[in-house]
């Protein structure tokens, strides 16, 4: 399965369009993604992947991958190709509007003259 979406909400302020392509492997064991930030350079970007509070993330030694361990079920490995990642705090709002602390994976970097392309994947382990 392939999903493609774009968002132009940053175009007025930053002159930027965010396009995301997501591909699911037939067996469901891997998700590949590509984020294209299309626009002029001169800015930095942050791509944020917010995690559910029941998922604990740990950055691995290569600084480009994180181990994602849910309370139950199989773990996953998030890998960003050619980019370092970081973990930051986030907030999760459930259906009852209760706020819970959680984590987010952040991919960051500078925009080139025509934007940036970030490739990533989630692999079941």
Regions found by a protein language model. Give the residues of each.
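CBM-like, beta-strand-rich accessory domains located in the C-terminal region of large
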Residues: 1-125
């Amino acid at each position: 399965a392939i999903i493609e979406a774009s968002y132009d909400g940053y175009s007025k302020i930053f002159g930027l369009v965010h396009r995301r392509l997501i591909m699911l492997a037939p067996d469901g064991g891997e998700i590949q993604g590509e984020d294209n930030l299309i626009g002029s350079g001169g800015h930095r970007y942050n791509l944020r992947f917010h995690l559910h509070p029941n998922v604990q993330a740990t950055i691995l030694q290569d600084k480009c991958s994180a181990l994602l361990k849910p309370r139950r079920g199989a773990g996953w490995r998030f890998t960003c190709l050619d980019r370092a990642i970081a973990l930051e705090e986030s907030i999760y709002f459930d259906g009852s509007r209760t706020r819970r602390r959680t984590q987010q994976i952040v991919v960051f970097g500078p925009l080139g003259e025509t934007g940036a392309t970030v490739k990533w994947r989630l692999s079941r382990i």
